[in-house]
């Protein structure tokens, strides 16, 4: 019914959010390899006996130190094994959601027997690349994912090529919902959020439900670095104030703790990342509760947060040396500012201050310490909002911040796309030397 009230640009915004904001169980880089392994295993009739896998340096970086849900183990080999033995390829980023205890035990046994090998794909021109080749007797199947965590581009078996993606991705990108973001602005996004029918964006409330549940789990259990629960204890000791700023810090940290610690609960992801989804969601939820927002106001604030985060991240490589919790928190800053005064200038100033504050934070792979960066980014977002509410912000006379927010965003993203590529290589070299 509401479709007739929505212009094509708004429809593209909605589709972009639906495309980029999805449930994901487990860190999405090892999950991408698990999906490749599951899809390959689905092509075979017999039991998988051995797995060879190849990944890009960036995917290796983000898969080396993170816990795979339900296994208590870290790394890409267990993800590949569990994907092949217990994964559901049709479930996308939730490929491991129905993996049984037996599948986990069998996957661990496969690793112990030395039947899983994960190697760097060399040479590799793709930032996000995962390939799994699984064997059953004399049969084998190989699945390749490129560009996005679930983008299967080729399926091949010992009998021949089953599927190959058409090579027209660049042309399709220009007219896709995400491609449209290259030709829009934050002002247009804000106008959309203010006027779009509530029923058209009600679905975004699922982000609050899923990421809110992760936050509660993080406070209940001892997940990851248990930053959220530790800070909550310090509140009880009188070492932290029990105020709105602390609530944002604790509840956002707790969700990331659970996520990175291997809790078997899905996150609502953003731009292929659970932590980005958490960062774009939980701070906005906390402020919405504080101001007594109803479901419609919460949905509009979450839509602004997630769409702003996607808008910024779309100008970045899918994976890079820049910690994207920072850009997701820029979306959160927009959502929180909207809840309080709704002014474009407040939103723009908050994002500019964020760029002047945390834009140098590096991504050194997915791990429990991501929760530290998530909490830092969420705190910086709230600080930037408080400054903006008093008409104070980092100005265009300082650093990489420009005189308008769109140029500030462009400046930040150009760093990640160009000069930080060398930083990324250095990070991967350091991490690889530790592995040996």
UniProtKB/Swiss-Prot annotation:
Any one GO molecular function term: L-cysteine desulfhydrase activity
Recorded hits in Pfam families, A to Z, give: SDH_alpha
Highest taxon listed in the record's lineage: Bacteria
Q: What is an annotated GO biological process for this record, any one? A: L-cysteine catabolic process to pyruvate
Family label: Belongs to the UPF0597 family.
Q: Which HAMAP family match?
A: UPF0597
What is the recorded name of this protein?
UPF0597 protein YhaM
The source organism is Salmonella typhimurium (strain LT2 / SGSC1412 / ATCC 700720)
Please name the gene that encodes this protein.
yhaM
